[in-house]
């Protein structure tokens, strides 16, 4: 699709995207980094990658063997 558009059209699209992005609120990383760290530490107990999945609730556990007769 990008090959079908002229350079002028591509630049217009880029300007429109930048106009949308400039409206996004910005925050200092010193503040947001701490908030993210606190959130991750608070939710670590609920993370199945950290604490594992109980065998009875594991959807990927093999249900049974394969029988060939």
Swiss-Prot record:
UniProt topology in membrane: Lipid-anchor
CC terms in the record's Gene Ontology section: heterotrimeric G-protein complex
Residues the record lists as Cysteine methyl ester modifications: 66
Gene3D superfamilies from the UniProt entry: Transducin (heterotrimeric G protein), gamma chain
UniProt subcellular location: Cell membrane
InterPro entries cross-referenced by the UniProt entry: G-protein_gamma-like_dom, GGL_sf, Gprotein-gamma
Main location: membrane
Lipidation positions, renumbered (S-farnesyl cysteine): 66
Residues excised as propeptide: 67-69
GO annotation, biological process: G protein-coupled receptor signaling pathway
Family: Belongs to the G protein gamma family.
Function statement: Guanine nucleotide-binding proteins (G proteins) are involved as a modulator or transducer in various transmembrane signaling systems. The beta and gamma chains are required for the GTPase activity, for replacement of GDP by GTP, and for G protein-effector interaction.
Assembly description: G proteins are composed of 3 units, alpha, beta and gamma.
Protein name, as recorded: Guanine nucleotide-binding protein G(I)/G(S)/G(O) subunit gamma-T2
Biological classification of the source: Eukaryota, Metazoa, Chordata, Craniata, Vertebrata
